[in-house]
Amino acid sequence: MPERIHRREFLKTVGPAALVGSELVRGAHSSTSTSTATSEPGTNRNARLLTGCCAYSYSKLLKAGKMTMEDVIRKAVELGVAAVDMTAYWFKSTEPAYLASLRHLAYKDGVCFSGAAIGTSTVQADASKRAQVLEEIRKWIDVTEALGAPHLRVFAGKLPDGATMQQGIKWTVDTLKVACEYSGKKGITLGVENHEGITQNAEVCLELVHRIASPYFGINLDITNFIAIPQADAYAQIEATLPFATHAHIRDVFENGQAVDLDRVWPLFARASYRGFMSAEYEGEEDPSTGVPKLVEKIKTLCRKYSSV
């Protein structure tokens, strides 16, 4: 993924509104989740934590032309995962025949597509550029439908020079609200990722959810992407946004090199009664051929430990 903005730069940009305190975390969780299950291994039968894999995990090999999207589907069989999140960057085309071939290959191999993922930036000061972004999202909603996938990951992006956080949020709300009206007619959910830019803070993600107010919108939750602040570390921000998670991307190392406490993360998903995919998104230094299986095995073990499946 692209290099992040520095924490100080981010906080300077968003100002006081970025301070996600414990009250927000508790309020967001308690207002949407009614589960009383504990986080003890194997006790939460409401959560359905399913192991998946992002095509992005093989980005090094895909960029080098050593793998294709067809190979990613075949890798899913080797890994024993239920689904693949199809990152759009390496599609040969968006022609119907190509998309149909991917869908058919996945069906024959017993693999489903948990979703598709595109790179977008809705924080455009120019209205004509925002219109172009909306059309691009609509295009990929159609692609997602052709694949038979239920979910499309989008980005909000970084603020342009001179723009305020509230402007960026408004531009994103205006664009994604219309996009959700389109995707909803096809039964496709849009998930904005807490990725580089305005959505690296839980409060902004929650504001987007509440202002867009669509059953076809939520948060594509990457557990390593939130910028920790004194009032809320990454784990607190994960918990705050979990009730609205549409898909989860899993890495085991934060950007600063610190290991993620996965045994702390999984109970949060269990208590929130999350039902969906925990998709490996490997970005380590090790070759993906050996690094991805190791991450997938960690995810499988934890899904069995904290889920009914």
Predicted regions and their residues:
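Short active-site-proximal "capping" loops at secondary-structure junctions
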Residues: 58, 89-93, 121
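Glycine-rich, proline-tolerant flexible connector loops at the mouths of alpha/beta enzymes
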Residues: 85-103, 159-162
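Histidine-acidic metal/acid-base catalytic patches
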Residues: 2-80, 199-309
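Short glycine-centered, acidic/aromatic-flanked micro-motifs in structured strand/loop junctions
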Residues: 88, 120, 156, 192-194, ...
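Short strand->helix junction
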Residues: 91-92, 123, 255, 285
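Conserved beta-strand positions in the central sheet of alpha/beta enzyme cores
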Residues: 85, 115-117, 153, 249, ...
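Charged helix-capping and loop-helix junction motifs
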Residues: 67-69, 98-101, 130-137, 166-176, ...
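Active-site acidic/histidine proton-transfer and metal-coordination neighborhood
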Residues: 14-24, 38-46, 103-118, 122-219, ...
